[in-house]
C-alpha cells in the first residue's frame, strides 16, 4: 500500500471539502467495504485533538458510519484504525452475523485495533494509542460481567491484550 499516494489523494479530497468521498476512497483502498454498509454521514466534531466515529442503524439492518468533518486532520494510521473499528461494527450488525451484546462488539473492535486479525492490511497505531485502545478493550471485557460466559469466551484475547499493554514502553 503506497501511503504517500493515498495521502496525496486524501489531501486533494480535503482541498475540495469532499470529506465523505475521501472516506469512501479510504475504505475502498483498504478493502474495508461490506454489503451492510449504507454509507457515510457527518457527526459533530469533538475537538481539534479528538474524534468520535459511530456506526448507526438497527441491529440486522444497514449501518451508516458517522464521521466528523475534521477526520482527515488526524494521523492516517489512527484514522484507518478508527474507520476499521466502525467497519467491523458494520459487519457485527449485519443480518446473519448480529452480535447482540454491545460489550462483546466493542471488545472485538478494540481487540482488532490492536491485533488486526480481520483487517491485516490496517497499519499499527502509536504505543500511546495501543495503550488507550487496550484499556478500552479491557473496560468492555470487565463490563461483560465477572465470570460470565462472554468473559470465558474472550479470556484468551484478554490475556493477549494485557500482555501487549505490559510489553509497551
Residue ranges and their predicted role:
Residues 81-84, 110, 114, 138:
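Hydrophobic core segments within long, regular secondary-structure runs in both alpha-
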Residues 5, 21-25, 77-78, 132, ...:
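Exposed alpha-helical structural elements
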Residues 28, 35-39, 97-98, 104, ...:
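Short glycine-rich, low-complexity/disordered patches
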Residues 81-94:
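Active-site recognition of the HExxH zinc-binding catalytic motif
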Residues 2-63, 72, 120-122:
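Auxiliary, metal-adjacent structural segments of Zn-dependent hydrolase domains
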Residues 119-169:
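Long, well-structured alpha-helical subdomains associated
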Residues 95, 101-134:
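Post-HExxH zinc-binding segment in Zn-dependent metallohydrolases
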Amino acid at each position: 500500500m503506497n501511503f504517500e499516494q493515498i495521502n496525496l489523494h486524501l489531501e486533494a479530497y480535503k482541498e475540495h471539502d469532499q470529506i465523505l468521498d475521501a472516506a469512501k476512497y479510504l475504505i475502498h483502498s483498504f478493502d474495508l467495504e461490506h454489503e451492510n454498509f449504507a454509507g457515510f454521514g457527518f457527526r459533530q466534531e469533538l475537538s481539534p485533538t479528538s474524534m468520535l466515529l459511530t456506526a448507526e442503524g438497527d441491529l440486522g439492518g444497514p449501518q451508516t458510519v458517522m464521521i466528523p468533518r475534521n477526520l482527515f486532520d488526524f494521523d492516517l494510521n489512527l484514522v484507518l484504525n478508527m474507520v476499521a473499528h466502525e467497519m467491523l461494527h458494520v459487519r457485527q450488525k449485519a443480518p446473519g452475523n448480529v452480535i447482540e451484546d454491545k460489550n462483546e462488539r466493542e471488545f472485538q473492535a478494540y481487540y482488532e485495533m490492536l491485533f488486526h486479525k480481520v483487517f491485516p492490511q490496517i497499519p499499527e497505531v502509536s504505543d500511546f494509542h495501543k495503550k488507550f485502545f487496550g484499556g478500552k478493550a479491557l473496560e468492555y471485557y470487565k463490563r461483560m460481567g465477572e465470570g460470565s460466559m462472554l468473559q470465558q469466551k474472550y479470556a484468551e484475547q484478554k490475556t493477549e491484550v494485557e500482555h501487549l499493554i505490559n510489553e509497551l514502553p
